[in-house]
Design a protein with these regions (language model features):
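Flexible coil segments in periplasmic/lumen-exposed cytochrome c-class electron-transfer proteins
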Residues: 100-145
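Sequence context surrounding c-type heme c attachment/ligation sites in exported
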Residues: 38-49, 63, 81, 105
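Electrostatic cytochrome c docking/interface patches
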Residues: 18-43, 59
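Compositionally biased, proline/threonine/alanine/serine-rich low-complexity intrinsically disordered stretches
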Residues: 12, 17-28, 137-145
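The canonical Cys-X-X-Cys-His
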Residues: 40, 44-55, 111, 115
């Protein structure tokens, strides 16, 4: 498992190096589609709600396993300054905690789109691509004022 995460991190680093010649875009610039966010919402209801709660606020009930908020300000503060490629690698290889790495690439990217939608980030015309170079070029940041 550790070697798999290390390999994914190295691939992500290579993608970041490749993307550095292109001006990054913000998660606030419509980087996913509404349909992608909806697929992520359906996945969340089936596989994520028991840990992250129905509103993605993290463990809100004593019977829930400890888990962080994965949307809104808490999520943005934790991930600000990183790119979506890093988030994709994290979700893809560590979720769900009881069966890490079992989400497909598509499920992982759809889950991220849902996190963005719940965080108030606007949908756009193009889906988040399962492409480390493209994802490395999308910056997670607080909403511009």
């Amino acid at each position: 498992m550790t070697s798999l995460i290390l390999a994914a991190a190295l691939a992500c680093a290579a993608a970041v190096a490749e993307a550095q010649s292109v001006k990054p875009v913000s998660v606030w610039s419509g980087v996913y589609t509404a349909a992608q966010g909806k697929r992520g919402e359906e996945l969340h209801a089936a596989a994520c709600v028991m840990c992250h709660g129905p509103r993605l606020n993290g463990a809100s009930q004593p019977e829930m396993p400890p888990s962080p908020a994965i949307a809104r300000d808490s999520f943005i503060r934790k991930w600000a300054g990183r790119n979506v490629a890093a988030l994709f690698v994290y979700v893809r290889h560590t979720m769900p905690p009881d069966a890490p790495g079992t989400l497909t690439d598509q499920q992982s990217i759809d889950a991220i789109a849902h996190m963005f939608a719940v965080s108030g980030m606007p949908a756009g015309d193009r889906e988040l691509a399962i492409d480390q170079g493209a994802l490395a070029n999308i910056l997670i940041e607080a909403q511009p004022k």
